[in-house]
Amino acid sequence: MDNNQKSKLSAIVFTDIVGFTELSAKNEPAALELINKQRDLLKPIVEDCEGVWLKEIGDGLLLTFNSSVEAVNCCIEIQKVAKNTKGLNLRIAIHQGEVILQADDIIGDDVNITSRIEKYAAAGGIAISDRVNAALVRNPEFSTQYLGSPNLKGVSQEVKIYSIISHGLPSLDPIMESATVNKQKMNWNIFSITGAVLSVVGILFWINISLLSKGTASSNKIPSVVIIPFENKGDSK
């Protein structure tokens, strides 16, 4: 690490607007207006929570806080405001880890982990890592639900993901829901293949019975000989 770079333990937050890509493709002015509205509404909340509004990444936000509890409380307030704002449907991820400060940016493995957790948040919800969950378990104000330990792209360590389900936040479990969808598809494929095999067997059985029936009927007939009269047209002697 460069001598001019400083590291710090922080609570890292990533946010993302659900459906923003589709909105941008259909109505770019409306998409830009939504980003401006997000900034106007949420930046004062982050500052009131003593958080750092580091940067905007497209429709997403990168924020940091001094503690996990501060980050969680602030994100709950953010979701309350977003819920009452048309089009501002957010997914939020929170993780705690060591970050390297670079001017108005941060880097580090834990920043990458936070960005990977974000997609496991429910729309309108907050997903957190096991480190953040550990800071909440002794506080009865918060309730969380374990989602699983998915393989996060570019992350070698195991990360357990939880969803905050108190404070009116949704309890959707995207990891389990995905597994259910895959299981249903697998069962449907098995049933389809089994049905196809049984259909083929049935057709072959029917053909076989038909051939046997024809063979039996033919064997019961008495063979006959057709005698054709022969006319001799040669010279008679």
Label every PLM stretch briefly:
Residues M1, G124, R131-L212:
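Intrinsically disordered, glycine/charged-rich C-terminal tails and inter-domain linkers
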Residues S10-I12, N89-R91, V159, V225:
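Structural motif
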Residues S24-N27, D104-I107, K237:
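Short, solvent-exposed loop/turn segments at secondary-structure boundaries
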Residues D2-E77, V81:
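Catalytic NTP-binding/metal-coordinating core of nucleotidyl cyclase/transferase enzymes
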Residues S210-K237:
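An acidic helix/loop motif centered on a single conserved Asp/Glu
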Residues K6-K8, G87-N89, N220-K221:
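Short loop/turn elements that form and flank the Walker-type P-loop nucleotide-binding site
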Residues G19-F20, G97-I100, E231-D235:
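A short, flexible beta-alpha/helix-coil linker loop
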Residues N3, D40, L62-E158, I165:
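Catalytic beta-strand-to-alpha-helix segment of the class III nucleotidyl cyclase homology domain
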